[in-house]
């Protein structure tokens, strides 16, 4: 009988420790998308922030070929632009050509009388930006001299020849008349005249060609005047010649007049090049030209311009990304990544966004997971997902708009005497690149910080929206989950997700279940404290009883206590 009573009491105690059945409660967790391996990006506060997705902003590779669309790309082949302009015999195919971009090859060479251009870079740039070699011959009158001088160093076919756009004037019989020729510009566009002066290798050659011991060439307009004297002397032999020609150029504005005065050594113009204002350019490159479409061209080849930055080459043509030093800059296009924990306990408990993200979400960035009497489930929240996507969409385009300037960066050249200018130019360019590289990194960090903040904010908005619906019917578990204190089947869970949940319907049931569960939790929670207090009181009582027994025994003489000193 005693055994039966003890067994009944034990069963009753065990039953009292069992909480209310899970059929009468449910758990609802809120979370966000996560991936197993995220991408590290820079923000204002952290250089290594992991996000679910990011887009590379720096174009670091080229196609390896120059695309001939949408621009007219002219392959210079074996000719430089200046040789083609002067009319070098092996460059005759380029006469009257037009281009958006003239491509000079490293294999280009001159094959006529050796020459130099004192202001080579400026002339090359002017002709390149004009985008045409359109030439108009004019009827210059050269009296008292012999025209169309030729050289064995400049052969057209099997015959001696000369630059087709220049007229080499030499003595007529035994004299060289003083020349004074004028040519007005009665048109409404600028005219580019190319002329030169011949530097013989010896005095004998000078008098043999021009009679006078020293000639002179003066070319003037209303705005400028140039007087050049020949420098007679031997130079290194080039194509059988130790003499040289120096090439000069003059631009005549509408209404202005070109005046040429000379008594020898003149390399005269045959006409003018029509100047055009445009955005044509020139580039040195050995990349092959192919049929394809890219709007940005570099010496390495064409590159896409769908990114705001590139570090392929400083020299570009077309609609190109901004050159920066960094090889990579990643723009966050997803939220902060917190990979999901693989182990969730014996019973597969679910956790909310405060603990970790959720992998495998395919129907949204944010969503719900639940456990109820019908099992477990997961669904995305389209409203918060779309709100985040709308703010992130267009972010890349906005960055491109801020940085992708529609212009071409031409290469800059300087002669040796302009070395200090070249050093200054290089310093300025390097400083600009440093500044843009810093600005690019700061801009991306700002955008990344904004992206992470706004995605975190959408998660918090969803959590607050859910909490306001549930009110006292559920309790915040502190990990992004709610403990719902009433029976909540899948239809009930769906009403919470879509915002149609009516907490009044479940309020009484929730309050009743909450009271029962809390009382059990309270009893279970204070059990350890009660045990410790009981143990302490028991020990105290045992000590008191033991002390009393000792005192009683001493009084009766049953115990003797001897103290020796």
From Swiss-Prot:
Localization, UniProt: Virion membrane; Host apical cell membrane
Q: Which residues cross the membrane?
A: 530-550
Coiled-coil regions listed in the entry:
none
GO biological process terms, alphabetically, are: clathrin-dependent endocytosis of virus by host cell; fusion of virus membrane with host endosome membrane; fusion of virus membrane with host plasma membrane; viral budding from plasma membrane; virion attachment to host cell
Positions of S-palmitoyl cysteine lipidation: 554, 561, 564
Could you list which ranges are Extracellular topological domains? 17-529
List all annotated glycosylation positions. 23, 37, 53, 78, 180, 300, 498
Keywords per UniProt: Clathrin- and caveolin-independent endocytosis of virus by host, Clathrin-mediated endocytosis of virus by host, Disulfide bond, Fusion of virus membrane with host endosomal membrane, Fusion of virus membrane with host membrane, Glycoprotein, Hemagglutinin, Host cell membrane, Host membrane, Host-virus interaction, Lipoprotein, Membrane, Palmitate, Signal, Transmembrane, Transmembrane helix, Viral attachment to host cell, Viral envelope protein, Viral penetration into host cytoplasm, Virion, Virus endocytosis by host, Virus entry into host cell
Using the chain's own numbering, where are the disulfide bonds?
29-481, 67-292, 79-91, 112-154, 296-320, 488-492
Give a yes or no for keyword Chaperone in this entry.
no
Pinpoint the site Cleavage: 344-345
Record membrane topology: Single-pass type I membrane protein
Q: Which Pfam families match?
A: Hemagglutinin (PF00509)
Query: Which superkingdom is the protein from?
Result: Viruses
Side of membrane Cytoplasmic, spans: 551-565
Gene Ontology cellular-component terms for this entry are: host cell plasma membrane; membrane; viral envelope; virion membrane
Where is this protein primarily located? virion
Q: Annotated Gene Ontology MF terms?
A: host cell surface receptor binding
Signal sequence interval, chain numbering:
1-16
Q: Which InterPro entries match?
A: Capsid_hemagglutn, Hemagglutn_HA1_a/b_dom_sf, Hemagglutn_influenz_A, Hemagglutn_influenz_A/B
Modified after translation how? Palmitoylated. In natural infection, inactive HA is matured into HA1 and HA2 outside the cell by one or more trypsin-like, arginine-specific endoprotease secreted by the bronchial epithelial cells. One identified protease that may be involved in this process is secreted in lungs by club cells.
Which HAMAP family does UniProt cross-reference here? INFV_HEMA
Q: What else is known?
A: Major glycoprotein, comprises over 80% of the envelope proteins present in virus particle. The extent of infection into host organism is determined by HA. Influenza viruses bud from the apical surface of polarized epithelial cells (e.g. bronchial epithelial cells) into lumen of lungs and are therefore usually pneumotropic. The reason is that HA is cleaved by tryptase clara which is restricted to lungs. However, HAs of H5 and H7 pantropic avian viruses subtypes can be cleaved by furin and subtilisin-type enzymes, allowing the virus to grow in other organs than lungs.
Q: Which family does it belong to?
A: Belongs to the influenza viruses hemagglutinin family.
Function of this protein?
Binds to sialic acid-containing receptors on the cell surface, bringing about the attachment of the virus particle to the cell. This attachment induces virion internalization of about two third of the virus particles through clathrin-dependent endocytosis and about one third through a clathrin- and caveolin-independent pathway. Plays a major role in the determination of host range restriction and virulence. Class I viral fusion protein. Binds to sialic acid-containing receptors on the cell surface, bringing about the attachment of the virus particle to the cell. This attachment induces virion internalization either through clathrin-dependent endocytosis or through clathrin- and caveolin-independent pathway. Plays a major role in the determination of host range restriction and virulence. Class I viral fusion protein. Responsible for penetration of the virus into the cell cytoplasm by mediating the fusion of the membrane of the endocytosed virus particle with the endosomal membrane.
**What name does this protein carry?**
Hemagglutinin
């Amino acid at each position: 009988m005693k055994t039966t009573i003890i067994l009944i009491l034990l069963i009753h105690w065990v039953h009292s420790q069992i909480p209310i059945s899970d059929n009468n409660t449910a758990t609802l967790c809120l979370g966000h998308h996560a991936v197993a391996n995220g991408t590290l990006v820079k923000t204002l506060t952290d250089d290594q922030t992991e996000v679910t997705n990011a887009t590379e902003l720096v174009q670091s590779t080229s196609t390896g070929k120059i695309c001939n669309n949408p621009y007219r790309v002219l392959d210079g082949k074996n000719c430089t632009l200046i040789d083609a302009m002067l009319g070098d015999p092996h460059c005759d195919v380029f006469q009257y050509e037009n281009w958006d971009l003239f491509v000079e090859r490293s294999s280009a060479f001159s094959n006529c009388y050796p020459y130099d251009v004192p202001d080579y870079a400026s002339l090359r740039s002017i002709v390149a930006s004009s985008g045409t070699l359109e030439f108009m011959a004019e009827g210059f009158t050269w009296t008292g001299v012999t025209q169309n001088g030729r050289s064995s160093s400049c052969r057209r076919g099997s015959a001696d020849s000369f630059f087709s756009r220049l007229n080499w004037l030499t003595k007529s019989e035994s004299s060289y008349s003083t020349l004074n020729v004028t040519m007005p510009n009665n048109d409404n566009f600028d005219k580019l005249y190319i002329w030169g002066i011949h530097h013989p290798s010896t005095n004998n050659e000078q008098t043999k060609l021009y009679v006078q011991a020293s000639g002179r060439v003066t070319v003037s307009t209303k705005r400028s005047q140039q007087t050049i004297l020949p420098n007679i002397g031997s130079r290194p032999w080039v194509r059988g010649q130790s003499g040289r020609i120096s090439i000069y150029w003059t631009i005549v504005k509408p209404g202005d007049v070109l005046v040429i005065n000379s008594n020898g050594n003149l390399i005269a113009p045959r006409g003018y090049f029509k100047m055009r204002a445009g955005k044509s350019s020139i580039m040195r490159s050995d990349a092959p030209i192919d049929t394809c479409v890219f709007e940005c061209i570099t010496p390495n080849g064409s590159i896409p311009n769908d990114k705001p930055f590139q570090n392929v080459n400083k020299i570009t043509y077309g609609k190109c990304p901004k050159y920066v030093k960094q090889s990579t800059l990643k723009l966050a296009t997803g939220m902060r990544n917190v990979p999901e924990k693989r182990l969730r306990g014996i019973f597969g408990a679910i956790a909310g966004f405060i603990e970790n993200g959720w992998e495998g979400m395919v129907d949204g960035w944010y969503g719900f997971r639940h456990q109820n009497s019908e099992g477990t489930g997961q669904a995305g929240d389209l409203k918060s997902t779309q709100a985040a996507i709308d703010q992130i969409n267009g972010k890349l385009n906005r960055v491109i708009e801020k940085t992708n300037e529609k212009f071409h960066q031409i290469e800059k050249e300087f002669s040796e005497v302009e070395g200090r200018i070249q050093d200054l130019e290089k310093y300025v360019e390097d400083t600009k690149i440093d500044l843009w590289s810093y600005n690019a990194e700061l801009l991306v960090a700002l955008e990344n910080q904004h992206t992470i903040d706004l995605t975190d904010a959408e998660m918090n908005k969803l959590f607050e929206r859910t909490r306001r619906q549930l009110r006292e019917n559920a309790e915040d578990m502190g990990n992004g989950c709610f403990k719902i204190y009433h029976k909540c089947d899948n239809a009930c869970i769906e009403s919470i997700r879509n915002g149609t949940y009516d907490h009044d319907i479940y309020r009484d049931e929730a309050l009743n279940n909450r009271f029962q569960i809390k009382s059990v939790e309270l009893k279970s929670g204070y059990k350890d404290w009660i045990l410790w207090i009981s143990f302490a009181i028991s020990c105290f009582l045992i000590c008191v009883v033991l002390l009393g027994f000792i005192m009683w025994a001493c009084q009766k003489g049953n115990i003797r206590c001897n103290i020796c000193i």
